[in-house]
Amino acid sequence: MAANRSRPVAVVTGASSGIGAATAVALGRRGYQIVAGARRLTRVRRVVGDLGLALPLDVTDQESIDTFVGEVKNAFGRIDVLVNNAGLALGLAPISQASDDDWIGMWEVNVLGLMRVTRACMPLLRKAKHGHIVNMGSIAGFETYKGGAGYTASKHAVRAISRTLRLELNGEPIRVTEIAPGMVETEFSTVRFSGDRKAAKDVYRGVKPLVADDIADCIVFAVTRPAHVDIDEIVIRPIAQAATWLVARKS
């Protein structure tokens, strides 16, 4: 894809499936030049098509991040929108039985990965006339639930990072938005339950959950507001979900 310096550039992490894929496509259709990053390069290439660049990215690996950002710099010279979407949940064990590996895995991606990518992209965000950082949080960043301590703690951290970024970037033309979805049917639960599709399907039993396009629509809304308007956060959940742990299910 030949770079067009007049069109805005949107970087989306975790773009091989789910919310990341839907967001890359939605922004591409709105005229953004897309740079989509993910570990599963073949899948992210299929997602992006002719909307932009598909590049390998592992947010737990600083060398991978540096190479990725270097490619963006060479192709476009700036980033107008950064969507920190890469994230995951692992397990539902109570704290008394918590797995170090699960907790480390979630924090490496959800928290440190977000920090590393944001840090590496900041010089290119500052090159844009108006930059925008969109962090994928969760309603789990506002609440807690049994068995979810590792994940909810990581999403509380995302909320803290987003709020701190607004303080640190105050006075600069860079907006910060946190998107906090509730129940969204994607590969999320399949990953959480280590590929157990029945357990993943049971999460959505008797409920019409959100889908990835619902979240992508919120992201498009936030980034297309006038430059002086900063949507701090959007909390979105299916009507059947009143809290992380309270869902009205139909038999």
What do the predicted segments below correspond to?
Residues S16-S17:
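Conserved glycine-rich cofactor-binding loop
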Residues L57-T67, D100:
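The beta1-alpha1 cofactor-binding region of Rossmann-like NAD(H)/NADP(H)-dependent oxidoreductases
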Residues A93-I95, D102-I104:
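Substrate-binding pocket helix/loop in short-chain dehydrogenase/reductase
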Residues T118, S154:
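Active-site helix of classical SDR
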Residues P123, L167-N170:
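Alpha-helical segment proximal to the catalytic Tyr-Lys
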Residues S138:
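Residue(s) in the substrate-gating loop at a strand-loop-helix junction
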Residues E178-G182, R197-W245:
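C-terminal helical subdomain
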